[in-house]
């Protein structure tokens, strides 16, 4: 985009941005699309010039920094970021990656200090700032204060775009306010074209929210529509199949879907857990143990996985080990009240009908 704008090919730049969806685009692409939509072409040259060798080298170093960051090598990532910023100090958007690196290193004070450099005039980067501040509040305090912060700031935004609606819906979903999440996912879906690349993902997220409030009819409808758009999506197949297993509904069909999901994403711990649980429900406890053991090794802090593994161990007459894993769940902060109540009963009575 920068090259097209700098060479006066604004209409070509517009054509490119027409195909960009805010929801699934990078931060920089979204900000560039926003500038073009608002005829702020001059903003590109304020931060980058294709004719400036330092700017071009700085961009290359920024890409290297991204690669190191994606491998969790934050020290090397910051090294290349500092070089990039030295060569092109105008490109303040490097700061977003520096902030992410500090955040993942749990250095929240440094992250908060740098976040203040992102101003309202660049609305996508400012929204990134608000989201990251909310995430830090969640880490340092709690999810409720985090949600209140992002909601109050969202209300001040004039004509929020679909990306902002999407992010707010995700905040509501993370905070288990599923009805509010559904409202915002629905607003997005109502605005999307049928050919939109992101529609299946939004349907999946809304379906998951419906499932959490036990509105299974609407949940199934969303999951199935998402699968019509993207038939091989492993995560939608997994979520729908697991929901059916929990409801003792279409067990054979659920197993078939899980096998497809597992073939596509055999390293995903949630899918491994689901297929293990499917074998448990079909009373193939040896196969179930194989998968659930792997899942609990990959996610030792997940309460559902530990509960499932405990159930399988019980059915294999390894009752002391079963109680050990159930007891683990009782110590986990993420364990929901309903699960804790069930495990307290199992700790005393064991598995019923075993």
Regions from the language model: what does each represent?
Residues 13, 77, 111, 146-147, ...:
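Single-residue signature of alpha-solenoid repeat helices
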Residues 23, 87, 118-123, 156-157, ...:
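Structural marker of alpha-solenoid helical repeat scaffolds
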Residues 32, 63, 97, 132, ...:
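Canonical tetratricopeptide repeat
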Residues 45-60, 193-196, 200:
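TPR-adjacent "capping" and linker segments in tetratricopeptide-repeat scaffold/adaptor proteins
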């Amino acid at each position: 985009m920068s090259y097209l704008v700098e060479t006066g090919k604004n209409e070509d730049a517009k054509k490119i941005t027409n195909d960009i969806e805010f929801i699934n685009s990078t931060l920089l692409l979204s900000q560039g699309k926003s500038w073009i939509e608002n005829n702020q072409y001059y903003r590109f040259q304020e931060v980058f010039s294709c004719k400036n060798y330092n700017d071009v080298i700085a961009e290359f170093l920024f890409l290297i920094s991204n690669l190191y960051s994606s491998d969790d090598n934050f020290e090397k990532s910051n090294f290349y970021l500092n070089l990039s910023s030295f060569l092109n100090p105008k490109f303040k958007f490097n700061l977003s990656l520096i902030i992410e690196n500090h955040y993942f290193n749990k250095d929240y004070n440094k992250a908060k200090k740098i976040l203040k450099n992102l101003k309202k005039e660049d609305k996508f980067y400012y929204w990134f700032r608000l989201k990251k501040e909310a995430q830090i509040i969640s880490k340092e305090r709690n999810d409720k204060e985090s949600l209140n912060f992002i909601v109050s700031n969202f209300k001040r935004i004039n004509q929020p775009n679909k990306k902002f609606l999407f992010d707010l819906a995700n905040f509501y979903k993370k905070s288990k306010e599923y009805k509010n999440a559904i409202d915002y996912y629905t607003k997005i879906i109502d605005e999307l074209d049928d050919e939109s690349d992101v529609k299946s993902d939004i349907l999946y997220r809304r379906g998951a929210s419906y499932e959490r409030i036990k509105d299974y009819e609407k949940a199934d409808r969303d999951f199935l529509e998402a699968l019509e758009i993207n038939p091989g999506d492993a995560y939608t197949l997994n979520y729908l199949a697991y929901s059916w297993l929990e409801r003792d509904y279409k067990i054979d069909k659920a197993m078939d879907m899980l096998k497809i999901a597992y073939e596509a994403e055999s390293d995903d711990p949630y899918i491994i857990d689901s297929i293990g649980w499917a074998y448990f429900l079909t009373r193939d406890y040896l196969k179930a143990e194989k998968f659930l053991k792997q899942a609990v090794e990959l996610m030792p802090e997940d309460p559902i996985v530990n509960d499932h593994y405990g159930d399988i161990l019980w059915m294999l007459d390894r009752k002391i080990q079963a109680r050990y894993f159930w007891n683990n769940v009782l110590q986990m902060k993420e364990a929901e009240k309903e699960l804790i109540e069930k495990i307290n009963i199992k700790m005393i009575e064991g598995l019923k009908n075993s």
